Amino acid sequence: MSVSMDHRVLALAGVAQALQQVRRIAETGHSEAATVRTAMDSVFRVDAASPEAVYGSAAALAPGLRLLHNYFRNQGQDEVLPRLALAVLQLERRFVRDASTVATVASGIDAAARQAQQLGDSSHPDVLGSLGGLYAQTISHLRPKVMVQGNPHYLGQAGVVAEIRALLLAALRSAVLWRQMGGSLWDFLFAKRAMIEAVDRALR
């Protein structure tokens, strides 16, 4: 059993889970509160002792793990989601190499964490607005740009756009964790079986 691969698939599930909510809110205007809270909590837990601790528990990543399970078995129902995930994983490389942007984002996350503590809710609309604004001011200027498509009616609403951007920030945070755990795009070519086995272990 590869502990590092087990950790990598948890982080990858965090990416998939956050992006699934991006897709959902872009199409319907609504998201799943518990899943969004898990994503936002992960943004604030920058000094967590383990990947499980970043998300609260491995169980909190069950939706993302199921997405990975289906993807690896060619049973995914959303063809856009893998493309979004690839864009975020590529964006992570550009982000971590931009020290100025990393510092600005870290400072903004600290401020949003204090706001979340005062409000008692990491997914409060004001917190989502702060994190969404932070993403717009910093990460959205990096390339490749993550393009989100959906229902124009909802994508024209400021609250929806803020939540989407906050979730993209959460997805990027998980991508950074994935890379820190040794993740690489080469895994999808040369370690696919190990990834599948790790996902299956996590879902047991």
From Swiss-Prot:
Q: Does the keyword Cytoplasm apply?
A: yes
Q: Which Pfam families match?
A: DUF489 (PF04356)
Please state the span of the N-terminal signal peptide per the UniProt entry: none
**Gene3D superfamilies according to UniProt:** HflD-like
Please tell me where this protein is predominantly located. Answer: cytoplasm
Xref: InterPro entries: HflD (IPR007451), HflD-like_sf (IPR035932)
Compartments where located: Cytoplasm; Cell inner membrane
- How is this protein situated with respect to the membrane? Peripheral membrane protein
Q: Give a yes or no for keyword Cell membrane in this entry.
A: yes
What keywords are assigned to this protein?
A: Cell inner membrane, Cell membrane, Cytoplasm, Membrane
Q: Which GO terms describe its cellular component?
A: cytoplasm; plasma membrane
Top-level taxon in the UniProt lineage: Bacteria
Q: Which family does it belong to?
A: Belongs to the HflD family.
NCBIfam families, sorted: PRK00218.1-2 (NF001246), PRK00218.1-6 (NF001250)
The protein's name = High frequency lysogenization protein HflD homolog
Q: Which gene encodes it?
A: hflD
